């Protein structure tokens, strides 16, 4: 019975996120948001927009989405929402958008267990090896505010920020081992980024007068988001409900902690402590995303399906799905209603607006590095340097062919192919796992 309820709720969630994408009201991928105004205004057709959405999203689905879910057994935002971005943009009407999204949700839940069982039965442990992705991804992602500072400001401010952020991690690990160092890193990094940006603009106030026309565009874009508030509130409710069912994790900073919290053999007290850590990490990450999501939403009139992502933490901490749904709807609705005020405040500081692109670039670069390093660890764990050699050969084959697989996804895809090849070699008697 529980499985059927989960399937229904997840199908409703993915159906609604696909509908939001179809209405150009909200998407998950930040890179898709800027192209949707062109679709709305008739400068681009759905096929063209859909092809762009596919190109931007498929690498994340193949690398982060599938690998994280196979490793942890938990659904994640990349696996659920990136495909619904594509389906929603491509769909010719609202009914088709909802239907295609719902079908995707059902397929994910019903196919996850068989695939997991198949992979865990293989002689070469592909799933266990993919667990090596987790530590580099989480640790690297926590540095995105710092790398954004490197991109935007001079070496002196970057050096000061680096010392503050990295020493914060050292102090937390040494004296506060019960806290999640990555969540504190993100928070301190964002405080430094906003502080440096605002200080820079205050010093150059005369050069950076507020653009009144820009504010009017902000208000015009916000009104379109508010018009879709009922749909966004439903999605916020469903996300929080799914998170409270212990089958979903919102991001890389919480998914591996929640995997431990929900695993067998963990006492209720230990589980709750881990859930609290995951919620804190998610909240800190959400704070880090406020400038990026708010500025892009105000500039494009397209919101994020999970808002500022605070609904994830709401879901983790809620006692049951009903309470989670109510709180999720309230939280994401409050975010939308506050968006105009946030936009006006951010609009006063051009450096904060400019930080959005730097944040996105920093996150992409860090994820590329982390997935490459994690994939190397995974290949070595799989079968030592035989696995490493095969994975590296596949990775550079992709490079030589002009990257048919996106650079970010290539290392993870290479490791997965390596695992398949090693299992084939085992069945032919050419390879024996150590």
Each language-model region and where it sits:
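A glycine-rich, aromatic-flanked flexible loop/lid motif
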Residues: 305-307
């Amino acid at each position: 019975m529980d499985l059927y309820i989960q399937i229904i709720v997840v199908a409703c969630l993915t159906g609604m996120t696909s509908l939001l994408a179809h209405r150009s009201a909200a998407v998950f991928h930040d890179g898709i948001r800027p192209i949707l105004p062109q679709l709305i205004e008739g400068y681009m057709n759905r096929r063209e927009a859909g092809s762009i959405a596919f190109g931007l999203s498929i690498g994340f689905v193949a690398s982060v989405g599938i690998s994280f879910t196979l490793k942890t057994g938990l659904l994640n935002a990349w696996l659920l929402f990136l495909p619904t971005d594509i389906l929603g943009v491509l769909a010719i009407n609202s009914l088709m958008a909802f239907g295609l999204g719902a079908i995707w949700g059902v397929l994910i839940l019903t196919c996850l267990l068989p695939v997991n069982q198949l992979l865990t039965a293989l002689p070469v442990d592909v799933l266990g090896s993919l667990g090596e992705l987790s530590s580099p991804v989480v640790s690297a992602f926590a540095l995105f505010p710092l790398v954004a500072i490197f991109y935007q400001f001079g070496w002196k401010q970057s050096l000061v920020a680096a010392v503050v952020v990295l020493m914060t991690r050292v102090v937390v690990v040494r004296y506060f081992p019960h806290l999640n160092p990555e969540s504190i890193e993100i928070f301190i990094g964002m405080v430094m980024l906003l502080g440096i940006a605002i200080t820079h603009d205050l010093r150059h106030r005369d050069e950076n007068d507020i653009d009144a026309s820009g504010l009017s565009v902000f208000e015009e874009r916000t009104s379109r988001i508010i018009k879709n508030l009922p749909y966004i509130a439903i999605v916020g409710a469903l996300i929080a409900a799914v998170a409270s069912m212990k089958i979903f994790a919102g991001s890389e900073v919480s998914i591996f902690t929640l995997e431990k919290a929900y695993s067998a053999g963990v006492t209720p007290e230990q589980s709750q402590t881990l859930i609290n850590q995951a919620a804190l990490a998610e909240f800190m990450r959400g704070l880090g995303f406020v400038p990026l999501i708010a500025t892009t939403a105000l500039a494009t009139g397209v919101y994020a399906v999970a808002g500022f992502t605070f609904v994830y933490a709401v879901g983790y901490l809620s006692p049951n799905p009903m309470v989670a749904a109510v709180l999720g709807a309230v939280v994401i609705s409050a975010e939308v209603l506050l968006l105009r005020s946030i936009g006006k405040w951010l609009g006063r500081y051009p450096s904060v607006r400019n930080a959005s692109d730097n944040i996105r670039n920093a996150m992409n670069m860090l994820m590329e590095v982390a997935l490459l390093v994690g994939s190397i660890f995974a290949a070595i764990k799989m079968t030592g340097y035989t696995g490493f050699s095969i994975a590296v050969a596949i990775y550079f084959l992709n490079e030589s062919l002009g990257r048919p697989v996106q650079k970010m996804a290539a290392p993870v895809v290479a490791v997965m192919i390596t695992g398949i090849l090693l299992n084939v070699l085992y069945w032919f008697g050419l390879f024996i796992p150590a």
